């Protein structure tokens, strides 16, 4: 019982840190766009220039992954703090002192419920890049991208 209370306290403290960081990247600036919107717009523009339509599925995937990595590098990657915090929060949720996966999924669902469409999209892009690490497995195994619109 005490372990669970301590875990809850730690989880929600870290969750609040995540929400603060999320606010910094989703808050609209004077130009009406957020850091996250600017980042996704830049990727979208770069992909349009790359003209994916004449390429095979694999070539289009490789091109999109390369454009994502170029955009990350050209921005000195302002979103890295967000990614580190998000993935740490997700792994914290999965370390809950609960014996079954259903209980752990309660915490994953709390996180997932706070993700915007833009966050889901950038998490998806990141999971397919060379920067993904263990994040791809985490995103798919726990269905974190469940609500990502197929229109992207």
Where are these regions (language model features)?
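Intrinsically disordered, low-complexity polar regions and short flexible loop motifs
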Residues: 2-152
């Amino acid at each position: 019982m005490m372990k669970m209370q301590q875990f809850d306290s730690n989880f929600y403290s870290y969750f609040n840190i995540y929400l603060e960081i999320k606010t910094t990247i989703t808050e609209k600036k004077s130009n009406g766009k957020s850091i996250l919107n600017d980042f996704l717009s830049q990727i979208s523009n770069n992909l349009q220039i790359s003209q994916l339509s004449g390429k095979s599925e694999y070539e289009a995937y490789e091109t999109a992954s390369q454009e994502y990595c170029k955009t990350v590098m050209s921005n000195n990657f302002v979103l890295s703090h967000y990614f580190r915090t998000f993935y740490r929060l997700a792994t914290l949720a999965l370390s809950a002192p609960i014996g079954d996966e259903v209980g752990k999924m309660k915490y994953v669902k709390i996180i997932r419920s706070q993700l915007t469409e833009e966050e889901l999209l950038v998490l998806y892009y990141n999971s397919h890049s060379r920067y993904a690490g263990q994040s791809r497995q985490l995103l798919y195994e726990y269905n974190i991208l469940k609500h990502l619109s197929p229109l992207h």
